[in-house]
């Protein structure tokens, strides 16, 4: 009886039973997808802002709020959720891959005595996992950018993808399979910048707040440090993000691409639209970052609790 009770509370060897890695990866992807449902409108507004005024044209939107109200007026409530299927697939591929790579590398680099990797090594692991996940998620990213951009174009110029799978099939058939990875370099670069900026700015912000004497090491301090970290991360990654967005949305003109590479995008944006146009869409990008992270962890915790209650207890 005692042995049975011990096995029920934990494993046969008395150790606590934990979720399999495959379940953890699955839950990570599902949690990211759940959060995306809530922040998709912010992603759409950010993408529209980054494409507004492209090529020295008159800006379609003055502010992020103007963009949101214009989209609602012209395309309705469903319009702000355009590209949701692509956003969900991006999370399913990017988040799951990133989590899987991070876990594998973390375990490989953990010492034989159980000593975890140091801060710098964890940063390298995080950036490597982020870049790999971004590469795998690039096809969904291309579909997302094009689907969210469609509504701003005249009807005869729209691509008219029905959903993310229709987009991927048509892109492959009409432009070649390599087009699915168009902009993968800036996409991977953004992931590296985001991971590096988040790690460095969060720890520094937290230490600064604690040293000020006004904060203790509690949830308020963590929240404020997260907000500062989000601000730094957004500022650092937006120029790379606008390069990614424009490359993935560009068309071929007389057989030639609108942009040669990410640097060409940055030079043209600064030349024709002004230096600060590199940060177009800053508000929705920053507003998306915090809620998406918080919601992802909330969903992840709830799924883990439910799994333990249903399959690991008793």
From Swiss-Prot:
Protein function: Catalyzes the transport of 2-oxoglutarate (alpha-oxoglutarate) across the inner mitochondrial membrane in an electroneutral exchange for malate. Can also exchange 2-oxoglutarate for other dicarboxylic acids such as malonate, succinate, maleate and oxaloacetate, although with lower affinity. Contributes to several metabolic processes, including the malate-aspartate shuttle, the oxoglutarate/isocitrate shuttle, in gluconeogenesis from lactate, and in nitrogen metabolism. Maintains mitochondrial fusion and fission events, and the organization and morphology of cristae.
Phosphotyrosine found at: 102
Modified residues (N-acetylalanine): 2
Gene assigned in the entry: SLC25A11
Organism per entry: Homo sapiens (Human)
Protein name per Swiss-Prot or TrEMBL: Mitochondrial 2-oxoglutarate/malate carrier protein
One Gene Ontology term from the biological process aspect of the record: gluconeogenesis
Gene3D superfamilies, per the entry: Mitochondrial carrier domain (1.50.40.10)
Tissue expression profile of the protein: Most highly expressed in the heart.
Modification type N6-succinyllysine: residues: 57
Modified residues (Phosphoserine): 6
Coiled coil: none
């Amino acid at each position: 009886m005692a042995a049975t009770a011990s096995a029920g509370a934990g494993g046969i060897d008395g150790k606590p039973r934990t979720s399999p890695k495959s379940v953890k990866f699955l839950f990570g992807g599902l949690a990211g997808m759940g959060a995306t449902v809530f922040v998709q409108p912010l992603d759409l507004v950010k993408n529209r802002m980054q494409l507004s005024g492209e090529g020295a044209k008159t800006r379609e939107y003055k502010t992020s709020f103007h963009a949101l109200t214009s989209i609602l007026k012209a395309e309705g409530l469903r319009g702000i959720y355009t590209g949701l299927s692509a956003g969900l697939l991006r999370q399913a591929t990017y988040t799951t891959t990133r989590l899987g790579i991070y876990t594998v590398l973390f375990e490989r680099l953990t010492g034989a005595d159980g000593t975890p990797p140091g801060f710098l090594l964890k940063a390298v692991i995080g950036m490597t996992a982020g870049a790999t996940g971004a590469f795998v998620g690039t096809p969904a990213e291309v579909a997302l950018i094009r689907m969210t951009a469609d509504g701003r174009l005249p009807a005869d110029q729209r691509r008219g993808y029905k959903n993310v799978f229709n987009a991927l099939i048509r892109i492959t058939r009409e432009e070649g399979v390599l087009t699915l990875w168009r902009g993968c370099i800036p996409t991977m670069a953004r992931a590296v910048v985001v991971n590096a900026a988040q790690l460095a700015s969060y720890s520094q912000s937290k230490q600064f707040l604690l040293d000020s004497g006004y904060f203790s090491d509690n949830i308020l301090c963590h929240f404020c440090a997260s907000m500062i970290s989000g601000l730094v991360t957004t500022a650092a990654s937006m120029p790379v993000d606008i390069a990614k967005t424009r490359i993935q949305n560009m068309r071929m003109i007389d057989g030639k691409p609108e942009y040669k590479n990410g640097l060409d995008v940055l030079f043209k944006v600064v030349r024709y639209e002004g230096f600060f146009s590199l940060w177009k869409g800053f508000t929705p990008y920053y507003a998306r970052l915090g809620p998406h992270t918080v919601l992802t962890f909330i969903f992840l915790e709830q799924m883990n609790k439910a799994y333990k209650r249903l399959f690991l207890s008793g």
